[in-house]
């Protein structure tokens, strides 16, 4: 499996509709397999999605410098390859993999400027106001996680040049959206063992249970991609320190929120009896799951910002309610949750507990 994925990196240049794929990005053919064990149907979705396998998290300054100098010594690069908060901006570099509206561009740009404390000129550079682009890396970070969740604990899979979460199915909740079970004639999702709230409560510890690997693209043409990624593969947790804690926490929080939203979509599909009333429908269902995983858009920047600010204020809210807030706010003047009342006053979000306003979030400028 690992060798076939590596071989596919340099061969596949076009997507399913024949459009040219950006050379720095990888389109791997999907492979959806199912396995039934004790009435539990497990889906394994093997795909690279649309993301850069080797250049996902490379610090921009080092990558550009080494490319100009023709540097080939990976050890020298790794000694200086320290992830700084500002380097996380590389996650937001646009790619032509999906369209993005001007509103989405401006909200994502404002989020980056606000959270990483940069001016708007830098924000415009990282996220141009152009509908041809998408905030690909933050958006596709979710796709990357979903593509890697099927990876087993078998050591050979750990080195596949795909960014992945540590998929120990005994402790990794986020793998469970791919698990459903049969209750008579009804298809129901398997209940998670660890909630996303617990993952988010990790504070600035970098969510140590989540292992995101990345590679540094240095010698792209003269060495096989597989060998190169084996040499330069890194784990983001290795880079965790006091200076990088905030950036890594933001990165992983975004991933957790996306995975939770995906699980909600999975639950909706799994409870659709008309579509899944027979076991023969499992294969089309898995194909639909793959399509969702490979094309899922980024969470709304305002919703993400709201969630982060609530976390900073130590306000608790059910994750299912959190991920539904933004879509409902488009039509409702207020959203009542189990613990808070969210009201919308001329675009402002006000979270109130009883009669006290606990959090006020102004809308991101458009």
UniProtKB/Swiss-Prot annotation:
**Among its keywords, does the record have DNA-binding?**
no
| Segments of this protein annotated with the region Important for ssRNA-binding and formation of complexes | 1-11
- Which GO cellular component term is one of those annotated? host cell cytoplasm
Q: What is its main location?
A: host cell
- What domain of life does the native source organism fall in? Viruses
Name the InterPro entries on file. Answer: Reovirus_polyG_pol
Tell me one Pfam family matched here.
PolyG_pol
Sorted keywords for this record are: Host cytoplasm, RNA-binding
Which cell locations does it reside in? Host cytoplasm
Q: Anything further noted? A: There is a strain variablity in the inhibition of the host integrated stress response (ISR). There is a correlation with the abilities of the strains to prevent upstream PKR activation and EIF2S1/eIF2-alpha phosphorylation.
Task: Tell me its family.
Answer: Belongs to the orthoreovirus sigma-NS protein family.
The role this protein plays is:
Protein that binds to ssRNA and participates with protein mu-NS in forming the matrix of viral factories, which are large inclusions in the host cytoplasm where replication intermediates are assembled and viral RNA replication takes place. Plays a role in the inhibition of the integrated stress response (ISR) to escape from host cell translational shutoff. Participates in the disruption of stress granules (SG) through its association with host G3BP1 and mu-NS.
Protein name, entry field: Protein sigma-NS
The uppermost taxa in this organism's lineage are: Viruses, Riboviria, Orthornavirae, Duplornaviricota, Resentoviricetes
Record gene name: S3
């Amino acid at each position: 499996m690992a060798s076939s994925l590596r071989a596919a990196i340099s061969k596949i240049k076009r997507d399913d509709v024949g459009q040219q794929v950006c050379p720095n990005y990888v389109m791997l053919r999907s492979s959806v397999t199912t396995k039934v064990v004790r009435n539990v149907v497990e889906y394994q979705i093997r795909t690279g999605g649309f993301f850069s396998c080797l250049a996902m998290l490379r610090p921009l300054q080092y990558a550009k410098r080494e490319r100009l100098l023709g540097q080939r010594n990976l050890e020298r690069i790794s000694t200086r390859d320290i992830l700084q908060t500002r380097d996380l901006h590389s996650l937001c570099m646009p790619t032509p993999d999906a369209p993005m509206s001007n509103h989405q561009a401006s909200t994502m740009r404002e989020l980056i400027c606000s959270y990483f404390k940069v001016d708007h000129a830098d924000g415009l550079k990282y996220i141009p106001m152009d509908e041809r682009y998408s905030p690909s890396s933050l958006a596709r970070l979710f796709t990357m996680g979903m593509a890697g969740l099927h990876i087993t604990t078998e050591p050979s899979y750990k080195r596949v040049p795909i960014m992945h979460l540590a998929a120990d199915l005994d402790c990794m909740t986020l793998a469970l959206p791919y698990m459903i079970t049969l209750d008579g004639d009804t298809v129901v999702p398997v209940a998670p063992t660890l909630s996303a709230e617990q993952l988010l409560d990790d504070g600035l510890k970098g969510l140590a249970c989540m292992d995101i690997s990345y590679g540094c693209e240095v010698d792209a043409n003269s060495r096989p991609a597989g060998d190169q990624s084996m040499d330069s593969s890194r784990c983001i947790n290795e880079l965790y320190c006091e200076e990088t804690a905030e950036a890594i926490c933001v990165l992983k929080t975004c991933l957790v929120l996306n995975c939770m939203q995906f699980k909600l979509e999975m639950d909706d599909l799994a409870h659709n009896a008309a579509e899944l009333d027979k076991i023969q429908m499992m294969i089309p269902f898995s194909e639909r799951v793959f399509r969702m995983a490979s094309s899922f858009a980024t969470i709304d920047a305002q919703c993400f910002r709201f969630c982060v600010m609530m976390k900073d204020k130590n306000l608790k809210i059910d994750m299912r309610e959190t991920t539904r807030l933004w879509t409902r706010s488009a039509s409702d003047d207020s959203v009542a949750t189990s613990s808070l009342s969210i009201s919308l006053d001329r675009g402002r979000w006000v979270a109130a507990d009883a009669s006290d306003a606990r959090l006020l979030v102004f809308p991101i400028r458009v």
